[in-house]
Amino acid sequence: MDDSETGFNLKVVLVSFKQCLDEKEEVLLDPYIASWKGLVRFLNSLGTIFSFISKDVVSKLRIMERLRGGPQSEHYRSLQAMVAHELSNRLVDLERRSHHPESGCRTVLRLHRALHWLQLFLEGLRTSPEDARTSALCADSYNASLAAYHPWVVRRAVTVAFCTLPTREVFLEAMNVGPPEQAVQMLGEALPFIQRVYNVSQKLYAEHSLLDLP
């Protein structure tokens, strides 16, 4: 995960997300992990404000990298293969955390939820006017996604922290693809791929009743 500290470029993340789905619409975990590493670089480039999310994401990515590099790596090539493997071998804690707190299914679910928040926030940045308040955009995205899984104390602290967010222009410049209007255009290309990966993952987890894993 050392490369999570290097510079962010939205084009690189776009390429990674384009590679996430194969011809069978399976979510390939290597490009999924690579995509998230790029998003972590974006969050880290904006300072410590998003550290409560990026630190958790980094820990989850390390778990997934261990699974991909372990003796059962062939079962972790895609999200679909992972779900089938872990469910058939009872490697998932379905009702309460006990024997498998670092199962791939639980780990990806946390990444999946965070991706929903980031997708909503980036879409807000893309479609909002130049003078839009990023604190409001981020809070709205958070309340529509991650907030449901955080205790009140965390929700309160996060909402207060959002008030210190930089301007919309600073966010767009942090994407390193040129002027703000070019970043908006690039987001328009990237977000449909992110949305597609999210939708396929959501459908898979819903089909197997995995959306509320402890």
Swiss-Prot record:
Result when mutating residue 149 to A: Reduces phosphoceramide transfer
Signal sequence region: none
Outcome following mutation: residue 56 to V: Slightly decreases phosphoceramide transfer
Localization: Cytoplasm, Cytosol; Golgi apparatus, trans-Golgi network membrane; Cell membrane; Endosome membrane
Reported impact of residue 118 to R: Abolishes phosphoceramide transfer
Keywords: Cell membrane, Cytoplasm, Endosome, Golgi apparatus, Lipid transport, Lipid-binding, Membrane, Nucleus, Transport
Residues binding an N-acylsphingoid base 1-phosphate: 56, 60, 106, 110, 150
Impact upon substituting residue 158 to N: Abolishes phosphoceramide transfer
PANTHER family: CERAMIDE-1-PHOSPHATE TRANSFER PROTEIN (PTHR10219:SF20), GLYCOLIPID TRANSFER PROTEIN-RELATED (PTHR10219)
Sequence similarity: Belongs to the GLTP family.
UniProt protein name: Ceramide-1-phosphate transfer protein
